């Protein structure tokens, strides 16, 4: 099947293209995180071009983004004969692995062991700010954090209290899930709902394009809010419906073999 003559593919790419300004380097991070995160996984320059250019991104922009990612320590590049190959550095693999559970988790978190940390205004703020860098904490206000898991034992300058039940007020829900995030999630949900089942003969590169677009859009939603159970979600939050649509489509687009990405379709 000619990659340039597939109406379903072209329409779906247009549907999934991020309505916000796309950062090409971020698209490439999503691509490697999905298709080539494992140690030793490599993608050729021609395969990258074949996957990314259908999104309306020019080869020159891909080269600039790769240069930035090399400079930032995410990606290494090498020559294989006349071809270029690209792969994640150890730093890049670690960064990708750190967010993989969030991106590919099929349900929201369901922790049951909550605690509150309260810092003295001023002197304890630095310690609280450090705690809030951990993924299992959210800020309630300037001096209070809510966390799940065991209560830390090395925070002598803060008050700690276990919480047996939680009632989440609307103002905190709105702070954790602000309106622009809710709107971005709703837009993704609406786009996914309009996509019909994939045809049976997509090329490996076309599959890579679609998976990258889906993961990139979902990543931009799911990594912008804490991983919290439904009691924290606003009434208009569509994240869980969106999550089901994301994985319903990804399941119909199995990961392509990396070697197959170098073979153009007939």
Walk through the language-model features, giving the residues of each.
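Short, hydrophobic-biased segments on the C-terminal half of alpha helices
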Residues: 63-67
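Mid-protein regulatory/catalytic core that forms ligand/cofactor-binding pockets
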Residues: 122-206
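Short alpha-helical segments that sit at the start of domains
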Residues: 2-31
